Amino acid sequence: MKKSILALSLLVGLSTAASSYAALPETVRIGTDTTYAPFSSKDAKGDFVGFDIDLGNEMCKRMQVKCTWVASDFDALIPSLKAKKIDAIISSLSITDKRQQEIAFSDKLYAADSRLIAAKGSPIQPTLDSLKGKHVGVLQGSTQEAYANETWRSKGVDVVAYANQDLVYSDLAAGRLDAALQDEVAASEGFLKQPAGKDFAFAGSSVKDKKYFGDGTGVGLRKDDAELTAAFNKALGELRQDGTYDKMAKKYFDFNVYGD
């Protein structure tokens, strides 16, 4: 009798675990901007690599679905999600009130502070007095673009938007920009620590404004995909709890990227 009860309990447990993901599609198409190392980029072989990619693959594994990564310009990600060309966004997408009017988000993936970079020795600071008359590059469709347009542009700062982050760095290095505003970690790991960024440094402290930058980044999802949102949250919670998240993060960062 005890053996029968144990066997039944195990069967019920397995059935429950399987049914929790039963409503999910077999394949989940995840959109990402591959110009944002170390979160999302492509290696020499054209494979998707980065912390966002590792997180997405691990969550899909736990959800028992196949991940298909779709490269996209950043500002096309939310329109593609709403048009059902992709099923989710994992691309350093900050959770903001404005975006939550359009789409749903998972729980926080990691923190996301923003910061200016400029040539080493430059006196530029993230203030109106310092930036007036200067050319500042931002990623099109990003929270940094929204912030710069609404707080700096009308005060005489030339805010220049680019389709991808690599173009921002390229024009900064070529001297066509005086500074660039982007995610702090992406700037540090994807530019300042690379050969192309050797003559540049952070300019001033982090730019903080919850209205524009939110409380961190998350998986972007359609509002009517409640099952998929719940599945991502469940998988994320598991990998945070069992230490997998910290192990993956250490591959890229020497600090607490999750934040408070």
Curated annotation (Swiss-Prot):
L-arginine binds at D33, S91, S92, S94, R99, T143, D183. One of its GO terms (cellular component) is outer membrane-bounded periplasmic space. The keyword NADP does not apply. Keywords: Amino-acid transport, Disulfide bond, Periplasm, Signal, Transport. SMART domains: PBPb (SM00062). L-lysine binds at D33, S92, S94, R99, T143. InterPro entries: Lys_Arg_Orn-bd, SBP_3_CS, Solute-binding_3/MltF_N. It is found in: Periplasm. L-ornithine binds at D33, S91, S92, S94, R99, T143, D183. Its main location: periplasm. One of its GO terms (molecular function) is amino acid binding. The keyword Disulfide bond applies. Disulfide bonds join C60-C67. GO terms for biological process: amino acid import across plasma membrane; cellular response to nitrogen starvation; cellular response to starvation; cellular response to zinc ion; L-lysine transport; ornithine transport. Residues 1-22 form the signal peptide. Part of the ABC transporter complex HisPMQ-ArgT involved in lysine/arginine/ornithine transport. Binds lysine, arginine and ornithine. Stimulates ATPase activity of HisP. Belongs to the bacterial solute-binding protein 3 family. NCBIfam families: 3A0103s03R, PRK15010.1. The complex is composed of two ATP-binding proteins (HisP), two transmembrane proteins (HisM and HisQ) and a solute-binding protein (ArgT). This is Lysine/arginine/ornithine-binding periplasmic protein.
